Every structure is written in structure tokens, then in C-alpha cells.
């Protein structure tokens, strides 16, 4: 569906105006189901969207079904350990195949006609396909009817998909960020990140559109009023805007290193000694929120559930194997709790914005010419995705 059928193109073009003249995306993009599906197909679908975490598939032969904005998908770790993503539907009559996450002992079996698939998606069994007790038929080629794969890739434990299949490679999209962060992480920092087997994760359900979570994360403008404890040491004036390519966010000169009972977490060995209190918080469009500090990093996947509902999935990463030892357990828990407080403080704001999107007295709003630069940048990026898709329609 071309977007001209849903909304005047002029409305999106107005988002692209200079910030002092621009207005934001209109309310329908936050409240209406057809626009939610448009986001799925044209904004998230034409880019690399995160749908889960590889370590949530703890063993080989493990499958995890998930719903991606109405599409039933299946994240699958095969018997050799490779993670792949497929449409979670039988190629025969379209029945949803897998209902619950877990280990597959033999084959994936369709509950309708008992067709079976291996853990690489190949169709292996077709009972009575050629008639009673005729389980093969020369008129039916099993190799043409396996599960339908999606283009997928993994970075920083996150599983990404590209629905359209034609986005540039994930590493190409990420290159501007990874190059930027070499100044902090060095060339080995990503390889040093470690996740706890248990712990170091949380999920928060918020009653807002996924885009509002991105917008809130991108800017520090709300800090003094929404995050009073954080503002005691990392004040508004200690922050700077970050805007480039598929990224927008904020940096801080005053992150407070984790210190619990005198225990400091291990830090990235390449992190500059004179910048230990620097931190950067960047959204990788469309639905990933990232943070790096000298002693840990985090990734948050935004799971769009409905026009007015999103689940935020956070994962923490610490530096090296030593950081996961019992000696640092209290420090790791303290980091988790501090982020739990910060993200909980944001809930009222993003849910308040969602409620406001139902008002005829608001339809996109205005931007601060200085403080809202990252937010406006995200609006422009989203508007361009939609305008580009309309041109291709």
C-alpha cells in the first residue's frame, strides 16, 4: 500500500522542514493500526529491525516463536549452533507451526497434517501426500516447500531481520557507529562484552507507540524533571547531542562509574583514562537503544506490540570474564537496579505522550531548535523512509 492512500505526502514533507518550522509526525502514525502496519512494512521492514537476542536460545536445536507486529516468526538455533529466522507457518496450509519456545528433539511437526521440517527449515516429511500410505509423490517436490527464511544477522547478541531483503548489509549500516566508538572501546571492546547467564536483563511493558520510546531516549532535555537522581551528577549541561546516519542520541561527560562497597567493575582496557566519566546513549534506527560506559554497555530492543503498546527488552554487557565473577555480583546488580529506576522514570512521560496523541488539540507538535535536534532527526529519518517507499510504490 502506498502511503498516499493513508496520509497526504505534504504532511510528511513538512516534517523535513528546518527544525524551527517543522512539525512532527502526525497522530495517526502513533494511534492507528494501518499506520502501525505501514511502520512494520516500510520503516522497520526496509531496514534492520531487532527481534530478539541470540543467547535467549540457550542450546542447539532450540526454537523461539515470536510475533513481529502481527507476523508470526521463528528464531531457530540449528543442531550446529547457527541462528536463523523463518516465517513460523507451515508451507502446506499456513498453520502456525511452533507455539512455545523450547528444544526440538526430532523434527518440527505441523499440528494440522503432520508435515515435518528439520532445523534448517527443509521439508522432510509429508504423510500421505500422494494418497494413503504414499508419503512421497513425484508431482510434489519437497525441496521447493521448506520454511520461508528471512534475511537475518547478529550483532552484540541482537538478532536482526530485514523483511524487504534489500537493505545494505547490517555491518555496513552499523559501521559509522562502530567507527565512532573505537575512541572509547578500541578495536577489541566489542569482543570483550560478556552477558550474565542469569540476570542482567529486564523487560518493561509501556503503553506507548514504539517511536515515542525512541524519541524520549534520543534527548536529554527532560533530564532535570524526569530523572532527578540522575540529574544530581549528570546534569543537563553535561550532555551533548549525537546525530549521524541511522543514529541519534546524547552523550554525557559526567557518568558516575559503578561503585558498590568500594568495588569498581572492570573497565574497557582501551577506554581513555581522561574520559572515564564519558558515556554515550544512541538509538540505532529503527528499534534499538544502545548505551556505552567505561565499565559496561547495554542494548535495548523495542518490541512494537500494538499502536499504543511496546515492550522494552534490556540486556547488560560487562567487560571480560572477570566481570562475571562472584566478586562483582553486587556491582552488577547495582548497575541493573540503577537502570531499572531510570527506565521506570520514563514510563509516565512516554505514556503521557501517547495519550496526547489522541487529542485533536495536538497533531505533531513543535521542536526546540536546540534541545530537540536528535528527536527531529529521528522524525525526519522516519518520514524519509515513508516518502521513499511511496516513490517506489
Task: Cite the ranges covered by each PLM segment.
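Short, contiguous pre-domain boundary segments
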Residues: 12-27, 193
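Short Pro/Gly-enriched beta-strand edge/turn motifs at strand-loop
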Residues: 45-58, 131-136, 282-286
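Non-catalytic accessory segments flanking enzyme active sites
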Residues: 18, 25, 29-68
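Generic structural signal for secondary-structure transition and capping sites
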Residues: 44-48, 95, 222
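Rieske [2Fe-2S] iron-sulfur-binding domain
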Residues: 56-164, 171-176
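Basic/polar N-terminal segments that are highly enriched at the extreme N-terminus
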Residues: 1-13, 387-393
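C-terminal catalytic domain of Rieske-type non-heme iron oxygenases
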Residues: 77, 82, 88, 153-154, ...
Amino acid at each position: 500500500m502506498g502511503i498516499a492512500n493513508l496520509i497526504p505526502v505534504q504532511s510528511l514533507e513538512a516534517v523535513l522542514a528546518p527544525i524551527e518550522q517543522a512539525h512532527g509526525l502526525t497522530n495517526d502514525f502513533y494511534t492507528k493500526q494501518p499506520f502501525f502496519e505501514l511502520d512494520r512494512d516500510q520503516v522497520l521492514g526496509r531496514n534492520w529491525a531487532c527481534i530478539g537476542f541470540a543467547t535467549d536460545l540457550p542450546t542447539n536445536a532450540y526454537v523461539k516463536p515470536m510475533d513481529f507486529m502481527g507476523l508470526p516468526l521463528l528464531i531457530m538455533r540449528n543442531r550446529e549452533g547457527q541462528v536463523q529466522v523463518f516465517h513460523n507457518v507451515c508451507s502446506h496450509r499456513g498453520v502456525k507451526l511452533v507455539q512455545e519456545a523450547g528444544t526440538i528433539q526430532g523434527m518440527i511437526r505441523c499440528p494440522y497434517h503432520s508435515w515435518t521440517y528439520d532445523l534448517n527449515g527443509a521439508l522432510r516429511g509429508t504423510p500421505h501426500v500422494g494418497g494413503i500410505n504414499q508419503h512421497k509423490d513425484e508431482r510434489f517436490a519437497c525441496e521447493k516447500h521448506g520454511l520461508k527464511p528471512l534475511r537475518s544477522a547478529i550483532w552484540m547478541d541482537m538478532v536482526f531481520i530485514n523483511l524487504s531483503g534489500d537493505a545494505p548489509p547490517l555491518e555496513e549500516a552499523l559501521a559509522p557507529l562502530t567507527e565512532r566508538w573505537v575512541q572509547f572501546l578500541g578495536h577489541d571492546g566489542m569482543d570483550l562484552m560478556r552477558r550474565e547467564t542469569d540476570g542482567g536483563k529486564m523487560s518493561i511493558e509501556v503503553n506507548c507507540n514504539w517511536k515515542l520510546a525512541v524519541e524520549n531516549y534520543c534527548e536529554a532535555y527532560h533530564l532535570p524533571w524526569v530523572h532527578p537522581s540522575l540529574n544530581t551528577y549528570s546534569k543537563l549541561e553535561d550532555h551533548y547531542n549525537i546525530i549521524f546516519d541511522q543514529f541519534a542520541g546524547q552523550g554525557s561527560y559526567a557518568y558516575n562509574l559503578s561503585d558498590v562497597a568500594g568495588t569498581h567493575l572492570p573497565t574497557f582496557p582501551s577506554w581513555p583514562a581522561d574520559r572515564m566519566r564519558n558515556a554515550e546513549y544512541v538509538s540505532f534506527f529503527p528499534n534499538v537503544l544502545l548505551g556505552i560506559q567505561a565499565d559496561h554497555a547495554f542494548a535495548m530492543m523495542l518490541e512494537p506490540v500494538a499502536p499504543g503498546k511496546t515492550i522494552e527488552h534490556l540486556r547488560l554487557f560487562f567487560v571480560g570474564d572477570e566481570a562475571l565473577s562472584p566478586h562483582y555480583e553486587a556491582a552488577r546488580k547495582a548497575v541493573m537496579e540503577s537502570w531499572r529506576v531510570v527506565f521506570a522514570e520514563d514510563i509516565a512521560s512516554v505514556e503521557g505522550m501517547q495519550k496526547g496523541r489522541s487529542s485533536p488539540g495536538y497533531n505533531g507538535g513543535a521542536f526546540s531548535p536546540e534541545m530537540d535536534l536528535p528527536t527531529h532527526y529521528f522524525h525526519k529519518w522516519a518520514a524519509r523512509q515513508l516518502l521513499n517507499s511511496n516513490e517506489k510504490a
